[in-house]
Amino acid sequence: MSSERPDGSAVGDAVPKDTAVGGATDSSRTSNDASQTSQDTAVQETPPKEAPAKEAPAKPASELTQSKWKIALLLGLILMSMFLVALDRSILATAIPRITDEFDSAGDIGWYGSAYLLTCCSFQLLYGKVYTFFDIKTVFVANLLLFEVASAICGAAPSSTVLIVGRALAGIGAAGIFAGTIIAMVFLIPLRHRPKIQGLFGAVFGITSISGPLIGGGFTTNVTWRWCFYINLPIGGVALIAIALWMEVPNKPTANLPLAEKIRGLDLLGTAVFIPCIICLLLALQWGGTTYAWSSGRIIALLVVFSVTFVVYAALQAFRPKTSTIPPLYFLPLWFQTVKGVSAAESGVHLLPVMISMIVGSVTGGFFNAKVGYYSPLAVTGSTIMTIGAALIYTFKVDTSTGRWIGSLILYGIGLGWSFQAPNLAVQTSLAKKDVPSALALIMFVGLLAQAVFVSVGDNVFDTQAARNLSWIPGFTASELTSSGAVSFLTALSPSQRVEAIEDYNSALRKVFMIGLVLCAVCVPGLASMEWKSVKSRGSWDEKPAAKPTDKPTEEKKVPPEAV
């Protein structure tokens, strides 16, 4: 309510202008008796046109301290860094055959991807803590520099072993860049605008999924596979220098903590237990049933170590809560190449419907969430559509028409683009500011871990099911299929055998698609059960609530310190 003065003006009509723009100032925190005289004077001296009936929403600190052009430039540089990391995940696929020919290292093929994924996944949670206690710009620039050095090592690698080491280092840097891009956005962009930006992040991954294999194939064919890594140097160098010079991130409450206290907060003991835990799990899933039998001593030992370290890590998180840290697109090219008989390049073209629709869904979903505010409706709708698309993919047969598989992929891509933003927006809207870095790191870790686990599970399911289906071929052995590759194995068969073998391949791949369908279906109730909150909600921790003309000056004192 506003109190009336002798001249008819209301106290609440003049004061909120300053408090809405500047936040809760020191003067607004003084007692009413001490500030009454100055407020009366301000009311009398303010012309009527200076006291609008409705004030604009308060701007967060990031909009006051940096211009829109500078924030746009910084976002472009951050997106460039994310582009490099995303490109690094897709550009290598077409270069691997040439790499193995040069190094005579067919047995190391799995390590070129696994070394990167193991370190990227294992260090994800640690970086959530690092960004909580240390300067965001310093950590981000350091990881970008590490990624650049690792790319140079990979490009100049004289042997397969050096290349694997370089990939492992690149994974560590990529983990820091993954976490840093989202966390930097939290401090640069107001919550109500973040859905649009996260839509751009999704578009970056979609673009690199399309361009990565094409760029890698072009370098490998026309220049050398080493340029798949060298390309990171000039692009990343520009981003690194510009971010180091221009990025400004507000100080966090933990900035002034002693170094020893920051290190204690990193949960180094938990990390030391967690990293071997995840490595043992991923190695067991990658090797089990393919390189080694599930009953072999190595696989059993890996699973035992994983189980023990997981229990220890869970105990550490439970008893030390103050420091605790807690696949259709992969197999579709194989379906196109084996069942539909297209080339590797053509299979990449056939993925365009799902990639383009995912980009469109991501961008449109971002703008929709920013406009409406509530992210849950689109998340539930998107996950439902994604599940329908996954169900249609599961029904693929040898004679599935072009229109049907294109429509199925479009549905899957649209649903994926609409729903993938929800977890990131949920933690930014619901959690306290100090908890957001760890929560975002946890989300990214779970995504990377799920990718590693279920791709390995899918590999095992396909190899096992295909070997069982093809056992009718005279002299066939499972090792023959894994050593020669699915496509090469088909070409070695007679025409009559090939027709039946293609049916067997399709049956095996449908088992893999069933895994994706189940995972998509599980997402629907999970997203539907999330608390409905709006990114425009009043009192978001990084934006001060808009002042209303009827607010009393004393009500501005109720703004919590963490909202400033």
From Swiss-Prot:
Belongs to the major facilitator superfamily. TCR/Tet family. It comes from Cryptosporiopsis sp. (strain 8999). It is a multi-pass membrane protein. Pfam families: MFS_1 (PF07690). MFS-type transporter; part of the gene cluster that mediates the biosynthesis of the dimeric xanthones cryptosporioptides. Glycans are attached at N222, N469. This is MFS-type transporter dmxR4. One of its GO terms (molecular function) is transmembrane transporter activity. GO terms for cellular component: plasma membrane. Keywords: Glycoprotein, Membrane, Transmembrane, Transmembrane helix, Transport. SUPFAM superfamilies: MFS general substrate transporter. The gene is dmxR4. Residues 47-57, 539-564 have a biased composition (Basic and acidic residues). The chain crosses the membrane at residues 71-91, 106-126, 138-158, 169-189, 199-219, 227-247, 265-285, 299-319, 348-368, 376-396, 405-425, 438-458, 470-490, 512-532. Residues 1-61, 534-564 are annotated as: Disordered. The keyword Secreted does not apply. It is found in: Membrane. Residues 25-44 have a biased composition (Polar residues).
